[in-house]
Amino acid sequence: MSKLIEYDETARRAMEVGMDKLADTVRVTLGPRGRHVVLAKAFGGPTVTNDGVTVAREIELEDPFEDLGAQLVKSVATKTNDVAGDGTTTATILAQALIKGGLRLVAAGVNPIALGVGIGKAADAVSEALLASATPVSGKTGIAQVATVSSRDEQIGDLVGEAMSKVGHDGVVSVEESSTLGTELEFTEGIGFDKGFLSAYFVTDFDNQQAVLEDALILLHQDKISSLPDLLPLLEKVAGTGKPLLIVAEDVEGEALATLVVNAIRKTLKAVAVKGPYFGDRRKAFLEDLAVVTGGQVVNPDAGMVLREVGLEVLGSARRVVVSKDDTVIVDGGGTAEAVANRAKHLRAEIDKSDSDWDREKLGERLAKLAGGVAVIKVGAATETALKERKESVEDAVAAAKAAVEEGIVPGGGASLIHQARKALTELRASLTGDEVLGVDVFSEALAAPLFWIAANAGLDGSVVVNKVSELPAGHGLNVNTLSYGDLAADGVIDPVKVTRSAVLNASSVARMVLTTETVVVDKPAKAEDHDHHHGHAH
C-alpha cells in the first residue's frame, strides 16, 4: 500500500490538530460540573457519558495524520485507565497542554531533545512530591469520600465505602447490571486473582474488554494443558451441559488453546483459559483454595488423576465469572460456606505456626482473598442509557477507591498540581541549565490546565480561578460543588495520588514522543469514488 509522508513542523502540526480534536471533546467531562458527551452507536441507542476514556475510545478521525495525533493522546487515557482506573480526562488535558506549549518552543528553535529531558525530570519531581504529600486512607468514611468525588454521587460513594471496608484491601468488588431501578450491595462467597485471559478472542463484553461467564463450570488443573486429545473428552461433556467453562491451569497452550479459541470464535463452546497465579507450591495451594470456593477438585496428575479420564464431577461451579486481561473474579462459587470457613481456619493455623515473615504475609494474602469474599454492587436505572452511564460511574469510583487505599490521597480540584507540584518544580528548576529549564517551565504552565477546565466547565473564568488558587495556601482551592474557596480536604474534595501521578507520568511520556517526532508515515487513504459524473444531467 502506498504511503503519505510529512516532515518537521508540518508533521507535528497535523498531529496537533488531531490531538486537539480529541482533547477538546474529552475535556468537557472534567470536574463535578463536567458536561455530557453523546456517542452515536452503529447499533442500538446512543450512549450518554461523562467518562473521559469512554469518549476517547470512540474517536477516529478521517485525516490519517490527524488521527495519528488523536491515537497518541488516546493512549494516554487508556494507559492511565489501565493503571489507576480513573483520571483519564486529567491525563488527556495535561498531555494537550504539554504538547501545545512544547511545540511553540520547538517552532521557535528550542532543542526538542533537551526540552523532552526537562519535561521528563519535571514529571518525576511532581510524582515524588505528590507521593510525599499524600495522606493515607482507611476506614469506610475516607474511602466513601474518594468514591463520591469520582462518581459525583453520594449514594455510590457510600456503597463503595461499605464494600471496600467489608472485603478489605485485597478483597474483590464486582460491578454488575441489575434488572431493578435501584443500586444495591450484596456480599457473596467468591474469590479473585491477578491473572487474565490467555487470548483476546475469549472476550464477550467488548465495551469493557471482559469475558463474562454466567452459571459457569470451572476446571482446575495443576499442570500445563497442551494436548487436545487429553482435553477433548471433557470439553465434549461440558458442551453437552450447555454451560460455559473456565479453565485455570499452570498454562494452556498449543492445540488445546487453539481449539478453545476456535470454539469461542464459532460460538460453539464458551470457554476461557487463564493461568493460575503464583509459582510452584504457592500455586498448588491457591488452586486448592479455588477448589474449596468453587466446590471442585484440582486435577492433579501427581495423584494419579488423568485429564482425559475425568468427568464433570471434578468441575467446580460459579454463578458468574468475569475475566479481564489482568484479573479473574469468581462470584458465588459452588463450594459450601462450611468448607470455606474450614479452609480459612486451616490458613490461620498455618500463619500462627510459620516462623517466616514472608510466608506469613503470603498466607495472609490468601486468607484475605478467601475470607473476604466478593462484594457485588448491582447497578440499576430506568433506561438502558442511564444504566450504562451509572455503571461506568460505579466502576470509576471502585477504581479510585482502590487507588486511594494503595497510595493515599491529596487535595483535589486540581489544587495539588498548583501547590505541591509547582513548589517541587521551582526547586528542580534551580538545578538545571539550558533548554531543560524550558521543559520545566512548560510543565509548570501545563499543571494549571486541569484546574482551568474544572472551573470553565462549571461556568467560571478558568484564568481567574487559577490565579486565585495560586495565591491560596497549600491544600486550599475551589470547591466547585459550592463554588466557594476553602480547605479542600476538609470539604471532602480529594484525589487518589495514584490517579494523579499516573496522569502526570503518562502525559509527559506521550508529550516527549510528539515533541521529538520529525517524520510521520501513514497509509494513503483509499479515495471514495466520485459518482457525480456518472449521473445525468438528463432531468
Curated annotation (Swiss-Prot):
ATP binds at T29, L30, G31, P32, D86, G87, T88, T89, T90, G413, D495. The modification Phosphothreonine is found at T25, T54. SUPFAM superfamilies: GroEL apical domain-like, GroEL equatorial domain-like, GroEL-intermediate domain like. Oligomerization, which is mediated by phosphorylation, is required for chaperone activity. Lower oligomeric GroELs possess substrate binding activity but are inefficient in promoting refolding. The binding of copper protects GroEL1 from destabilization and increases its ATPase activity. It comes from the Bacteria. Phosphorylated on Thr-25 and Thr-54 by PknF. Phosphorylated on Ser-393 by an unknown kinase. N-terminus is acetylated by RimI. One of its GO terms (biological process) is protein refolding. Its main location: cytoplasm. Disruption phenotype: Not essential. Increased heat sensitivity (at 55 degrees Celsius). Inactivation of the gene does not affect cell wall lipids, or growth and survival in macrophages, but mutant shows slower growth in the mouse lung and spleen in early infection and fails to produce granulomatous inflammation in either mice or guinea pigs. This is associated with reduced cytokine expression in infected animals and macrophages. PROSITE patterns: CHAPERONINS_CPN60 (PS00296). The modification Phosphoserine is found at S393. Induction: In response to heat shock (45 degrees Celsius) and hyperosmolarity. Its EC number is 5.6.1.7. The modification N-acetylserine is found at S2. GO terms for cellular component: bacterial nucleoid; GroEL-GroES complex; peptidoglycan-based cell wall; plasma membrane. Forms a cylinder of 14 subunits composed of two heptameric rings stacked back-to-back. Also exists as lower oligomers, including monomeric, dimeric and heptameric forms. The switch between the single-ring (heptameric) and double-ring (tetradecameric) forms is mediated by phosphorylation on Ser-393. Interacts with the co-chaperonin GroES. Belongs to the chaperonin (HSP60) family. Each subunit is composed of an apical domain, an intermediate domain and an equatorial domain. The apical domain is sufficient for substrate recognition. Contains a characteristic histidine-rich C terminus which is essential for copper binding. Copper binding causes conformational rearrangement. This is Chaperonin GroEL 1. It comes from Mycobacterium tuberculosis (strain ATCC 25618 / H37Rv).
